[in-house]
Every structure is written in C-alpha cells, then in structure tokens.
Amino acid sequence: MSLQKLMEPEAGTNRTAVAEFILLGLVQTEEMQPVVFVLLLFAYLVTTGGNLSILAAVLVEPKLHAPMYFFLGNLSVLDVGCITVTVPAMLGRLLSHKSTISYDACLSQLFFFHLLAGMDCFLLTAMAYDRLLAICQPLTYSTRMSQTVQRMLVAASWACAFTNALTHTVAMSTLNFCGPNEVNHFYCDLPQLFQLSCSSTQLNELLLFVAAAFMAVAPLVFISVSYAHVVAAVLQIRSAEGRKKAFSTCGSHLTVVGIFYGTGVFSYMRLGSVESSDKDKGVGVFMTVINPMLNPLIYSLRNTDVQGALCQLLVGKRSLT
C-alpha cells in the first residue's frame, strides 16, 4: 500500500476541517472541578519547586558536579517542562469554564509533549550508561564520561527526541478531522486523536510502532542489560557499605525507569481499543503529573549528597551568585 493511499481519507467522509477540539478533562461534574483545580495547582507548585530546587543544588554544590548529577539536573528540567505542557492549560480551562482547544494549539501540545517524553527515554538510558561505567569500569570512568561525552549524549538525545516529535506532529497534520471533535482526555495525545480521524491512521500507527521500538524497547533492553552487569559487579564488592551505596544510587534510577516505562507501555500499546476510557486519563495523570512530582522525592530521599545540598541551599549557606 502506497504512502499516498495511507494518507487519503476514507471514501464518502465529510472533509470539513475541525477548527478546535473539546477536551472533556478529568471530571465532567462541576462540583468536582474546584477540587481538581486545587489538587492540580498544588501538584504543579510542588513539582516545579522540587525539581528547580534539585537543579539549583546541582548547579551550586561542588559535590554534585559529577556526571550522574548533570543528568539528574537535566531530568529536573524535563519534569518541569512535562507538567508545564499540560497542567497550566488545564488550570486555565477550569477557571474559564471553557473546554476547547484550537487545532494548532492541540498539535503544539502534542509536539512538546512527545519532545519531552522522548527526551526522557534517552536521558534515562544515558543515566544507566553512566552507572554502568561508574560501577563496572571505574578506572576509565572519568575519561569515558567526560564533560564532552555528557554534552554529546544530551545533545544527541534532544536531536532524536525532536525528530520523533516532529515526525508524529507532521503525520498527525495530514489527517482529516470532520467530527465528532470531543477528546476524552485532558490533553492532546496520539491515541485519542487517532480515534477522531475520518481518514486512515495506518501510517500514523506504523510510525508509533516504529518509534516505540526505537525509543522504548531498545532503551529498556539496554537499561536492563546494563543493570544486570551492575548488579553482578556490586555483588562482588566486599564492603557492605559499598554495596549499599551502589544499590541506593541505582535503586532510585530503576524506580523512575519502572514508573516511566510502565505508564508509557499502557498508554501506547493499546491502540486496538475502540474508545478512550478513564483508565487512559489515570495513566495520563501519572505520566504528566505524578511522575514529575515523584522524581525529585525519589532521588533526594535515597541520596545523602542531594539531601545535604538541598539543606545547604534551603538554609542559605550557599547562594546562586
């Protein structure tokens, strides 16, 4: 089947363009909307405050000027970006009692969401590679994970994530939407928009499948293999304190990986379902709100260096100047 055929609308469909979508949101009862507003506002403030605090600690604390914390600082930026793409717009709709989003704004939200989510995939992989070198090859670690290598890994991650997000957005822009225009979600995402298209989504679903293999399966396999080597190396450490410290740094990362990939698999591996459900909204909340809010807690609670840097930052022993 040709590329042109895949992008053609189905015969007999009305080709009238949809100018805006209606996002049904998390709840549709007016009584619950103030509660949802307060909870989302609280989550947004906690997430931005927590992640920006970790970023500030990484920048000002010399102990944290190491590759692992360089990647952690980047992860904090991503977490702030991820929740900012969805939550402020939803808060605005709750305040204005308007649930519409323009077609262009919907595509923009789709692009930035997949840009940041894709970057998350590659950054978590880079963090696993960092732990692999630090624990399994400590003698060459400083050379193989130099500042140049760190920056190259982050730059390559941004380039791959940008390419993926742009591909999905351009492919989505080729679809025809002729009604209905109600999105059973609180932000614009691929599976929900596929269900509203009156043209074929075969190409889009194929692209999503290929992207999942490249950006989810391959990184997850690499992370799993890396940590298998890490566990084998840690078990050979004779010092109980050394084993505990190694497992604590790796445990935080594995927890974040498990939550991130678990929610991602549930969201994008269910394209055969006929319609969106409240489960999709729950997973969406986990991906865009809970994950970014939990990440700083997961890393700070299990890492004494981060805890110490945050305490120094909060009591004012160090300043950003």
Curated annotation (Swiss-Prot):
What stretches pass through the bilayer? 35-58, 67-88, 110-129, 150-167, 206-228, 246-268, 282-301
Q: Where in the cell is it found?
A: Cell membrane
- Record bears the keyword Repeat: no
* Main subcellular location: membrane
Q: Which UniProt keywords apply?
A: Cell membrane, Disulfide bond, G-protein coupled receptor, Glycoprotein, Membrane, Olfaction, Receptor, Sensory transduction, Transducer, Transmembrane, Transmembrane helix
| Membrane topology listed for this record | Multi-pass membrane protein
What Gene Ontology molecular-function terms does this entry list?
A: G protein-coupled receptor activity; olfactory receptor activity
Function per UniProt: Odorant receptor.
Q: Which family does it belong to?
A: Belongs to the G-protein coupled receptor 1 family.
Question: What is the protein name stated in its UniProt record?
Answer: Olfactory receptor 3A3
Question: What species is this protein from?
Answer: Homo sapiens (Human)
Q: What is the lineage of its organism?
A: Eukaryota, Metazoa, Chordata, Craniata, Vertebrata
Gene from which the chain derives? OR3A3
